[in-house]
Amino acid sequence: MEYEAERAEFRQAFEAAGIGRRVKRGDCWWPVRLGRSYYNAMDRLVVEVFRTEDLDIEHNFEYGKPVCFFSQTDGAVQLLPWTATVSYAEDERMVIVLPNEGVLSQLGSIERLGVGLGFDESTYRLMFQALDAVMTAREGRLAHLRDICHGGVRAQRSAAPAVPVSLPWLNAAQQEAVREVLRARDVMVVHGPPGTGKTTTLVEAVCEVLRREPQVMVCAQSNTAVDWISSQLADRGIGVLRIGNPTRVTESMLAHTYEHRFSAHPDYPALWSIRRNIRQLYSTPRKSRSRDFHQKVARLRERADELELRIRHSLFDNARVIASTLAGAAHPLLGGQHYHTLFIDEAAQALEAASWIAIQKADRVVFAGDHRQLPPTVKSRAAQTGGLAESL
């Protein structure tokens, strides 16, 4: 219901605003000219798009944003029934990742083509997948955590920590909360009204857990919340690796993003050189290519893949905290990753379905937040009535 409500709201707003108004806001290019299409270094099909009018208007397109193509016939706007993603955007040119080869011919058949910022369905898709996994789980940690969170099974606690915890800079309630986090085998909730030091307590809990575990995951519903708790941990000297779209990360956390760390890695210049060689090979006219062209490209790609994997493993091996939004926990970089402990900050503002995206990757989860503060944002009244506004 919420998905359909948001999708309908976007479509109505897109059509009601009119193309001219959206162009002036920088949310739309119309008309556009298609440039070349090719497979990029990540082996994704992309197409170049050039705007031909209103070149002086500053636009809002940037890396990672979803976009939708449309046509206009007799004043009526027709949205194409699929979304694409911005790979690169400059003043008059944009490179867009397409979902498949079939849509390319569809774009070429439209006379007056336009492109605008689109409705981001990716988070809903991830939530649907997470809910399906949770509901169908019959055994294992996911099924166990589901049964605990929904009251079917009691959460278990360990005995007192083997190493006594003394944190004199915390008050008695905060110290006890940290101890309870260490004792929790399955689920723990750290809650309290504003001003009680939840963030301070959570930071200390993460630090204490890291004395016992090599790595933890820290998530929140919003990028702002993730960056806040991550910055507090980074200030303590803890190695944080921030996963997510760098354009949505606060300036203070940019140096901790995967992309920044990747490009700063000692092996990156060698990888960049190999990728440049691949691009140069592809820039050679087809008639001038040598017989072993494909073998050369294959060898270079194999070396590039090996280097990229080595850099990735190095970054993850050296990080103590992996930080992302709840939806960001499904990032391809985190595929196959699993953590003993997951911390979810501002948990009262998190949609339950979004929480399960991250919980799938953990053996136990620590929720932190205040259930008396703002609930998750839900636009559909029917969805609110159905319980979507209730967080875990």
Tell me what each language-model feature is.
Residues G192, N245, E346:
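The Walker A (P-loop) glycine that initiates the GxxxxGKT/S ATP-binding motif of P-loop NTPases
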Residues T196, T201, A205-A234, V240-G244:
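Conserved RecA-like ASCE P-loop NTPase motor core of nucleic-acid helicases/translocases
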Residues M1-Y63, M94:
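A helicase ATPase "motif cassette" and its flanking acidic/Ser/Thr-rich regulatory loops
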Residues R212-P214, S222, R236, H313, ...:
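Conserved helicase motor core of SF1/SF2 NTP-dependent helicases
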Residues P161-L167, L254-H340:
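Conserved helicase NTPase catalytic core signature
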Residues W169-L170, V178-V187, V209:
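Phosphate-binding P-loop
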Residues A173, A184-V190, E213-P214, R320:
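Pre-Walker A (Motif I) flank of P-loop NTPase domains
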Residues E58-R179, D235, S252-R276, Q280:
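Pre-ATPase regulatory/linker segments immediately N-terminal to the P-loop/RecA-like helicase/translocase core
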